[in-house]
């Protein structure tokens, strides 16, 4: 049986190996692919920052994950992505699917997937990954509004991101926005996906609101 300490030690070992590999981009912003939106944001979203992605309701959780993963892909052209996932997400929505991740544009070989039962463990793993200079993006998924995820915890993530150059994306489901150190905050819901030529379901589509 793997203990919390063993799991965290294994993650530290993985991160240490990554630090001997490719370095993330040093550009201060990453484009969202929409010139109008990039312009409104001053050139795109900032790297080395904490950004929050909220599902409009639990039913829109998979869309929030998909949008956050799309941001991670935009932010991280080549460096590893560390995805720290609370097990509640697997129970409610199923496990990440490698072929689907690849179809979205992320090579699964660049993905380090960490699962944790409790929000506290998600935060510990995300903070450890955010301190690793070889990581491009950390995607942390937390269910609900646990007490451990307070303003202080978000500040720790934000400071770690600023120091290392890592972009941190916190996906929240079944949670209301609260005080945090996030640079931006998004609310996501599913949108109708339709191929204009065939009328059949097409690429993933999201309805997104920038809250902050």
Predicted feature residues:
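Phosphate-binding/switch region of NTP-binding enzymes
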Residues: 170-212
């Amino acid at each position: 049986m793997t203990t919390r300490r063993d799991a965290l030690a294994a993650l530290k070992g993985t991160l240490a190996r990554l630090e001997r590999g490719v370095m993330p981009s040093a550009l201060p912003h990453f484009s969202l692919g929409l010139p109008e939106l990039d312009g409104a944001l001053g050139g795109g979203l900032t790297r080395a920052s904490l950004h929050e992605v909220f599902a409009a309701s639990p039913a829109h959780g998979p869309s929030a994950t998909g949008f956050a993963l799309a941001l991670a892909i935009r932010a991280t052209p080549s460096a590893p992505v560390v995805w720290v996932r609370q097990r509640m997400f697997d129970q409610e929505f199923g496990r990440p699917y490698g072929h689907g991740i690849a179809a979205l544009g992320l090579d699964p070989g660049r993905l380090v997937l960490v699962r944790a039962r409790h929000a506290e463990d998600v935060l510990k793993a995300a903070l450890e990954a955010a301190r690793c200079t070889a990581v491009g993006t950390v995607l942390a998924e937390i269910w609900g509004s646990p007490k451990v995820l307070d303003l202080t915890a978000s500040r720790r993530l934000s400071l770690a991101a600023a120091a290392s150059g890592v972009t941190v994306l916190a996906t929240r489901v079944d949670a209301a926005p609260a005080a945090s150190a996030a640079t931006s905050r998004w609310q996501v819901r599913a949108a109708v996906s339709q191929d204009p030529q065939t009328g059949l379901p097409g690429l993933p589509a999201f309805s997104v609101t920038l809250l902050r």
